[in-house]
Amino acid sequence: MDRRNLCIKVTRWILQADLWWLIGKQANGCAFMHYGDTTVLCTATASEKPRDGIDFFPLSVEYEEKMYAVGKIPGGFNKREGKASENAILTSRVIDRPMRPLFPKDYRNDVTLNNMVMSVDPECRPELVAMIGAAIATCISDIPFDGPCAMTQVGMIDGEFIINPSQEQWKKGDLNLTVASTREKVIMIEAGANEIPEATMIEAIYKAHEVNQTIIAFIDKIVAEVGKKKHEYTSCAVPAEMFEEMKKIVSPAEMEEAVFTDDKQTREENIRVITDKLTEAFAENEEWLAILGEAVYQYEKKTVRKMILKDHKRPDGRAITQIRPLAAEVDIIPRVHGSAMFTRGQTQICNVCTLAPLSEQQKIDGLDENEVSKRYMHHYNFPSYSVGETKPSRGPGRREIGHGALAERALIPVLPSEDEFPYAIRTVSETFESNGSTSMASTCASCMSLMAAGVPIKKMVAGISCGLVTGETDDDFVLLTDIQGLEDFFGDMDFKVTGTTEGITAIQMDIKIHGLTRPIVEGAIARCRDARLFIMDTCMKPAISASRTEVGKYAPKIISIQIDPDRIGDVVGQRGKTINEIIARTGVKIDITDDGKVSICGTDKEMMDKALEMVKIITTDFEEGQIFKGKVVSIKEFGAFIEFAPGKEGMVHISKIAKERINRVEDVLTLGDVVTVVCLGKDKMGRISFSMKDVAQQ
């Protein structure tokens, strides 16, 4: 087999790209990547012809987690991999975001980047290998691509940065940062952080950028040796002469007047009127009619960008640092455990919080063997009515999963520990109305919903998005605080930052250009800090200033007790008989951890206390003189057996039943009687002995 491989040392491990001419040879580009013992097969494939009737670049990125990579057989009936996991979807999105801007904007051929994880070394994260491998496979292919780009991950433990941390370090650190770069600029940022100060975050971003330059040089070397010549393609750009004719029919001033409104629906109606006018004018030109939608979009885009860049004039009339009108309210939904509504302009999110015992946390069956469950879940829904459209609901797509994960990541650093608050927590963000930055509105609504539910979060968290419009030079740019949908569509950047008053908890940066300069990155982070502090002070804190001291009226209550781990079996009983008996009698839920922590969850305080007392009785060493209440469960000639807790029985000898002599147990007791007994210790056979006559009967 003709085999060629190239290597580079990245931190502690060797990154190797195997370029086998007899592997994946029908793909346009293929790289078999190794980093330590982590192995990922990365391919880039493009269709031969452009797809007809579309006005976008059809890029698909797949990250496939094979369970054999960690020596597992998949669960489920079929015992094979099914739909992509949440982690696989999020990784696909992280790979997509830096690569998409580097493809030609007028390219309409379908492109698929496949990344198949074939083995996992816990010291070398497969997501990172897939990111770099996808870039290599695309760069060496004949697919038009203005690369290379490279990615690096940064963690932080005890204030020290760790480049490309292991799985364990990634989980334990205060920072999870992924940065993609081109030769000169940063093109993608994704971060979760434990209230990292802005200056520290910027330092980490540019440490990753430095490492990326080494990887880019490595990719350049690979392309020089095995890269293919990029193929020619049919441009789908709107002809310049069509634009000139459009301007004669609809002047730039008319277009500016159409888009200059703070109401999204009014603007859309204005554009429909313009489109109808142009459709009538071009009725004889079928070629132009076929691309009229794209042409109007481009005309509107140029108009908006000129307004912002040259005149500092936003479509809704705001100043470049101004946030849309804000409103917040809690307890808007009855009977739920917690709820909140957050509104920013024409973006509105209702969030509902639900609390449950830890047994209901999400189980995870993935490649990371250290991650088996998730206690906090945030789910984001985006129905079609929120943007005035009609579309059937097909369940959450990649966008919904990505937005949900971002708001989830934003709040994890401020959640109480399991010991402080032994609940599984789910928040659901329902998008009532959307005109940009719903993920940041979801973060604000989720935070208030948690506080309303009585979750003792450490600090309030808010989020905001910063946009960008660039000119011909790096110094010619305008940053926009709180972008609406139009500024997101026609702008160059969506820079989302969440955090507390102390620092950043999450970042997600999407761009449509070939990277950002350092002044833009620093300016966006500073702008987002000012905005989130303003949102907290003027909107969120007036609605709810601190977490409630108790969980909601309809939320389950939890009481806990620590028992000797050796007594767990006593509580569970044979085949679960004892614990199921406690649950059946009291209606509570019981969770037991391996270290002996027993959590009792319910809504009836009396029944919870009863279950707790049962657990205490079962796990306590019996002492002479202890008094119990129990039920007669068996009668013998020599005495009666009393069940004083599920699975626990003691015997009252016939001589200990009454103060006077009795001939038959049945003369005093019948099955099912509830009696009070005092413990006499254990008899010669190790059984618990009780007396009824030495304690008052009720």
Show which residues each predicted segment covers.
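Flexible, glycine/charged-enriched surface loops at secondary-structure junctions
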Residues: 105-111, 146-148, 215-233, 265, ...
